[in-house]
Structure formats: C-alpha cells, structure tokens
C-alpha cells in the first residue's frame, strides 16, 4: 500500500490486540508493551513518522528520542513532527520520491518557492515559514551531528556578533538558516471587540438567530457548556491547550465571599513553556462554570458511572482523597501531586468520590470522557459555520479569544492606570508604579509571556486605533479585577 504523504503518529502505551485469527507469535508483540517501552526509553505520547510506503524509519525516528526533543513540550514535539513530515512529503511527491538522506540545498529552495511564492502553493506567512524551517533545521542539525548525513539541505549564514560589554560573545560556528523570512511578525492580530464577541457566541455557539433571539430549530445539547468554555477563555487569556488541561482541583467553586473576581493557579506542568501563573476569573463566568459542573457535567458522569465506563479505563491515575489532590497510578506505589501531571496523564486521572470514580478533567463530553483539543477546534469551526448560515459575518478561533482578552484588558487597564496617576503627585506616582507595575507587564504575566516584547504587539494594535474608536470598541462594561488589584496595592 502506498499513500502520498508522511504521517505523524503518537507512541501508544498499549496496542489493541489483533483478531483471534492472527498467529499467536504476532499476538505476543502486544503483550508487555508498557514494560518494553520503559526498557528502550520510549515515552508514551512521543511522536513518530510513518513513510508513504508505511515504513517506520528507525534512524529518522530516533530524532524524537534525542535529549533536545525530549526536553520540549509535547505540543512542540508534534509541531516539529508535522513540519518535518510536510518537508519529507514534498521530497516524496514533488522531488521524485527522494529520501531524507538525499535531500540537498536545491530541494529546500524548491520547497521555499512552493510554500511561499508558487501560485499553486499555499503561500504561507513569514512567521509560519520560519516555524517550519526551524523544525526541519533542528532535525538536520541532529542528523549531521550524529553522522547520519554529511550536510544539511538547509543553507546557513553566520550570526552577526553581538556588541556591548554585557552580552555574551558568539562563537564563530554559530549559524542560523539563511532562508528565514524577513517579513515575519507583521501579521495582523485578529481580535473581537466585546460586542462582536457576544454576537459570535450567541449566534455561533448558542444557536441564536441574527437578531439575537433563540432559534426554535437549534438542537445544541451542549450550547451552555460551549458558551461557558468560550467565556472562560476570553476572560482569562488561557491558551486552548491550557484550558483543556484544567481539572476540578484547579478551578474553585464560586462563593459570594470571593468578590467579583477570584483567581486560581495554572500549574507549570500544563502551562506553555512552564509559565505557571495566577489566572483571574470574573465571578459571573465562574458561576457559569459552577452551573456546568452541577448539572451538565454531573449528568454525564452519572450516566458513565452507571454504564461502568470508568471501571474499564486501562491503568488510570487515581486520586483517593479529593481533599488532598495526590494521584497514584494503578499498580504503582508512588504518589504524584496532580499539579505535576501533564495533559496526557490528566486525561487518565480519576477521582474516587462517594458516588464512585469520575474523571478529574473539568471539560467532559456526552459520554463522560475528557474532551480533546480537536473536539474544541471542531466546536469553533461549527460555530463559524452557523454564523455564516445566519448571515453574520464573524468568525473566531481559540487563539483569537486570547488576543481579545489581551487587547481589551490592556485598553481598560491603561485607562484606569492613567486616571489613577492623574490624581497623584510625583512621589505617589512613583510608589504606585513601583508597586502596581505598568498595565503591559500585568497583561504579560496573565498571558504567560516571558518577555514584555512579545506582549507589545497588543499595544501596537491599540496604537493603530483612534481614541474615539477605542472607546467605542472597548466599552467600560467589561469588568476587570480592579478590586483584586487595589487589594494588592494596599497590601504592598
């Protein structure tokens, strides 16, 4: 069998048993798989590539087991795998079925022309191209270093020497791909003003008509859950992967004494780049999350428990005492704090409650199983289709909600910041700025950016708008954690 593309797959801890008609010696290959993976040092969830002729290249796939790759986040590993697979597919389909060992500089340049300039190609943006080149370059740097190929097909140029007494000197052999795009970083930041977000949510997610009224023919069983998911994302700035990884232990129940805002800790194990941080949630949104937990979530959990679905989970992690979130893998004697579990492990995490076992993951589907990122992406796609069908010219994706949070929050924080400074004399302003910091840095910390330079893109978005337009697009009704901020300043 021959297909036309390299494919990305994930290493599974267990394989399904072949049919009974398969010879017994073949069935042996599926037994003791978990132990074998540990012996050879393969982590479940590690990506690997399958060739168009369905071959597993042992040498090529060692790249994903190298120290540099194993230290990266799982999503980053799969990003590298997809970008490498795309280049290898190009070699196969457009370069006479050339193998990765035979690729030369001319193949990389042909790939550049097709990806960015060819009228029949995808014409990708500079930032996307740079990401793809980085993945392919990392693979070939590894292949050259360990001796699998003599040279890399990605042409290199020497980095310019740094200047300044406090900057580390670069060595002469430090290089970077010569084909990096110079137009990266100029892409427009897509965001929705609060009013447009509500229209998109009501029409696309809740199934309302264009006039904002409930539509009789809409059968959205999970409209309330999906709308709550979107509201939480647009009001916290969490990434899709981060919000998908939340458990019932991270998100608190709302109580009246929490005030208009409360916060929870996003642990390092699920925060991108290890950017653990406090996440602020409006009380209104947290109340909607509570309603989902009490009704929709509780119903599917009860149905799954009655059907015995959780008892059939293979090798789950179990929290034996919900008051103390420590988990133990079935068959293991070691306990691990839930906050240290990655997304893959959290999807196998059960909580032993008086009613029986139930998943620790916050967001569950109709079968009572944790929802995947792909399921949420399809929810956004379906919502956009409903908007088009209703004649509403709005579309949204998960990261666009993160952009919306950043732009709206930065604009409102700037207004409050300037108003506070205007009422103070110079020494008070200095003290206020030292304690509170500036709005841009506050947004940076909420987004989990390492550098404020990354967050500056949202300041540039606001700089492009006239003040009257900013006041119209970002009304004052979008409440902020002002009381929390004031308490922080007062305590300091």
Enumerate the language-model features and the residues they cover.
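C-terminal secondary-structure termini that scaffold catalytic or DNA-interacting sites
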Residues: 2-5, 453-456, 467-492
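N-terminal core-binding DNA-recognition domain of tyrosine recombinases/integrases
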Residues: 60-76, 84-171, 207-210, 214-217
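Short, charged phosphate-coordinating catalytic segments
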Residues: 146-150, 233-259
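Conserved tyrosine-mediated DNA breakage-rejoining catalytic core shared by Y-recombinases
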Residues: 160-164, 245-352
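Long, amphipathic, Lys/Arg-enriched alpha-helical "connector/arm" segment
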Residues: 168-222, 265, 271-273, 284-287, ...
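Basic, Lys/Arg- and aromatic-enriched nucleic-acid-binding interface segment
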Residues: 202-240, 428, 437
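Short functional hotspots where side chains directly engage DNA or cofactors
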Residues: 256-259, 265-268, 397, 421-462, ...
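Short, basic (Lys/Arg/His-rich) helix/loop patches that form interaction surfaces
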Residues: 377-445
């Amino acid at each position: 069998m021959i297909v036309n593309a390299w494919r990305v797959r994930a290493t599974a801890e267990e394989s399904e048993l072949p049919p009974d008609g398969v010879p017994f010696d073949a069935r042996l290959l599926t037994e003791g798989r978990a132990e074998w993976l540990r012996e050879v040092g393969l982590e479940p969830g590690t990506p690997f590539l399958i060739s168009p002729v369905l071959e597993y290249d042992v040498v090529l796939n060692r790249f994903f087991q190298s120290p540099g790759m194993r230290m990266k986040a799982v999503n980053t590993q799969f990003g590298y795998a997809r970008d490498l697979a795309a280049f290898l597919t190009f070699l196969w389909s457009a370069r006479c079925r050339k193998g990765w060992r035979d690729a030369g500089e001319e193949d990389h340049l042909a790939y550049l022309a097709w990806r960015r300039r060819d009228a029949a190609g995808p014409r990708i943006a500079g930032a996307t191209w740079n990401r793809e080149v980085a993945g392919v370059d990392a693979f070939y740097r590894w292949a050259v270093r360990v001796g699998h190929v003599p040279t890399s097909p990605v042409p290199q140029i020497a980095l310019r020497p740094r200047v300044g007494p406090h900057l580390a000197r670069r060595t002469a052999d430090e290089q970077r791909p010569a084909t990096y795009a110079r137009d990266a970083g100029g892409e427009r930041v897509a965001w929705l003003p609060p009013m447009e977000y509500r229209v998109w949510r009501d029409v696309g997610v809740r199934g309302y008509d264009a006039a904002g009224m409930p539509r009789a023919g809409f059968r959205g069983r999970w409209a309330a859950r999906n709308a709550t998911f979107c509201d939480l994302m647009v009001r916290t700035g969490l990434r899709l992967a981060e919000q998908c990884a939340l458990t019932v232990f991270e998100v608190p129940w709302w109580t009246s004494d929490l005030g208009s805002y409360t916060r929870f800790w996003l642990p390092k194990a699920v925060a991108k780049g290890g950017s653990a941080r406090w996440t602020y949630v409006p009380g209104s949104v947290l109340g909607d999350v509570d309603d989902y937990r009490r009704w929709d979530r509780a119903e599917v959990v009860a149905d799954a428990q009655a059907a015995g679905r959780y008892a059939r989970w293979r090798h789950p992690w179990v929290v034996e005492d919900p008051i103390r979130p420590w988990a133990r893998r079935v068959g293991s004697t070691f306990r691990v704090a839930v906050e240290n579990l990655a997304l893959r492990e959290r999807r196998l995490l059960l909580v032993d409650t008086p009613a029986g076992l139930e998943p620790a993951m916050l967001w569950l589907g109709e079968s009572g199983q944790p929802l995947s990122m792909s399921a949420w992406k399809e929810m956004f796609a379906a919502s956009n289709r409903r908007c088009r069908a209703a004649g509403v010219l709005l579309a949204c994706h998960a990261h666009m909600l993160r952009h919306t949070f950043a732009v709206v929050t930065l604009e409102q924080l700037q207004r409050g910041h300037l108003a506070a400074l205007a009422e103070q004399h110079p020494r008070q302003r200095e003290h206020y700025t030292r304690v509170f910091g500036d709005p841009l840095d506050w947004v940076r910390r909420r987004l989990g950016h390492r550098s404020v330079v990354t967050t500056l893109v949202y300041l540039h978005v606001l700089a492009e708008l006239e003040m009257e337009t900013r006041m119209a697009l970002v009304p004052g009704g979008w409440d902020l954690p002002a009381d929390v901020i004031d308490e922080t300043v007062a305590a300091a």
